[in-house]
Amino acid sequence: MDFDKKGGKGELEEGRRMSKTGTNRSNHGVRNSGTSSGVLMVGPNFRVGKKIGCGNFGELRLGKNLYTNEYVAIKLEPIKSRAPQLHLEYRFYKQLSTTEGVPQVYYFGPCGKYNAMVLELLGPSLEDLFDLCDRTFTLKTVLMIAIQLITRMEYVHTKSLIYRDVKPENFLVGRPGSKRQHSIHIIDFGLAKEYIDPETKKHIPYREHKSLTGTARYMSINTHLGKEQSRRDDLEALGHMFMYFLRGSLPWQGLKADTLKERYQKIGDTKRATPIEVLCESFPEEMATYLRYVRRLDFFEKPDYDYLRKLFTDLFDRSGYVFDYEYDWAGKPLPTPIGTVHPDVPSQPPHRDKAQLHTKNQALNSTNGELNTDDPTAGHSNAPIAAPAEVEVADETKCCCFFKRRKRKSLQRHK
């Protein structure tokens, strides 16, 4: 999220203005929180359960659709937020969520002192899976991720949006056991922005002296330099994330400074001073070719997504890999908000091209049966929701995942 609060007023004001442009809520009936039984509800049928994530603008709760018995994710934002953005994010999801790889959005409406957005519940994030795999992915896994995410980002861009929040925490696999459990999904459009003006239908103008928006570890060099972001910056940030997965860390992690501003300056300086050849040393040349291409793009230029995809699909085929969705975490127990799941390795994997088609997202399998005492949304669901204290983010990432991460004392994360 926008971590430079002292210098990020422009972005926050922009978010306020944009959020006011869309006032239509979901067609579902609106229902305030609380019922005669004291259970916290969103709309007519979504029961609010335990907290499973948090962010700078609110928190994430596990929920349940009482009509279908399906679990959902419920994102909450205080109505009196100084920089409301949830309705804007809801609008972006409505623009996007008719394709594979974007979670379905089910509802937007009030929940007591909060606005609530109800989303499809997904599985672990790539960061969680990275931990599960001892913080290194094989080339095969990175290429399967990269091929899908280039397609995801291309789709976002075709909807006149730039994403501006690339990081492993924002890319999730489907919920284990669902039809899309092996697809990589993109979530959290709180920092997304329209790069095509809806009035003029023209590309936004090039600007400088912009506040930093995104995650410092992965953001593009031009973002560090205060330049307005465009399509090229999303793709460069993806390239940095791909190298993070292959290397296990990036050269600009772990830098120390007296202030956050100085730290982000050091990250940007180190990023610029690290030659692409050094960053990608000992890895296939295609990784360096990708980064060279996206860094040379003009601000207004439309990237050649097919070229970038072909770079990786050709490398994938030459390496003798099969696109069988057997990632490095295949067969490992996956933690979810409703318990650990032991996924099955796909016996009849879909063809690679299916991950790139913009087909309608399928609903998750319902959790059949009556509600019981083991239901994570049943207990303490009438507990008050405490808005997280507004604190300055002290590192490049924030907590924003679909389940709580286990703390590891032996490892310093997000340096």
UniProtKB/Swiss-Prot annotation:
Compositionally biased intervals (Basic and acidic residues): 1-17
Protein name: Casein kinase I isoform gamma-2
Entry comment, domain topic: The phospho-regulated basic and hydrophobic (PRBH) motif is sufficient and important for interaction with phospholipids permitting cortical localization. Phosphorylation of the PRBH motif by aPKC inhibits the association of the protein with the cortical membrane.
Renumbered residue ranges of the record's region Phospho-regulated basic and hydrophobic (PRBH) motif: 369-415
Alphabetically ordered keywords of this record: ATP-binding, Cytoplasm, Kinase, Nucleotide-binding, Phosphoprotein, Serine/threonine-protein kinase, Transferase, Wnt signaling pathway
Annotated family: Belongs to the protein kinase superfamily. CK1 Ser/Thr protein kinase family. Casein kinase I subfamily.
Organism: Rattus norvegicus (Rat)
Start and end residues of each Protein kinase domain: 46-316
Tissue spec. comment: Testis.
Composition bias, Polar residues: 20-37
Domain of life from the UniProt record: Eukaryota
This protein's record includes keyword Ribonucleoprotein: no
KW Methyltransferase (keyword) present: no
Record-linked SUPFAM superfamilies: Protein kinase-like (PK-like)
GO process annotations (BP): endocytosis; positive regulation of canonical Wnt signaling pathway; signal transduction; Wnt signaling pathway
Entry annotation: catalytic residues: D165
PANTHER family: CASEIN KINASE-RELATED
EC number(s) from the headed UniProt entry: 2.7.11.1
Entry-linked Pfam families: CK1gamma_C, Pkinase
Amino acids binding ATP: I52, G53, C54, G55, N56, F57, G58, E59, L60, K75
Top-level taxonomy: Eukaryota, Metazoa, Chordata, Craniata, Vertebrata
Function: Serine/threonine-protein kinase. Casein kinases are operationally defined by their preferential utilization of acidic proteins such as caseins as substrates. It can phosphorylate a large number of proteins. Participates in Wnt signaling. Phosphorylates COL4A3BP/CERT, MTA1 and SMAD3. SMAD3 phosphorylation promotes its ligand-dependent ubiquitination and subsequent proteasome degradation, thus inhibiting SMAD3-mediated TGF-beta responses.
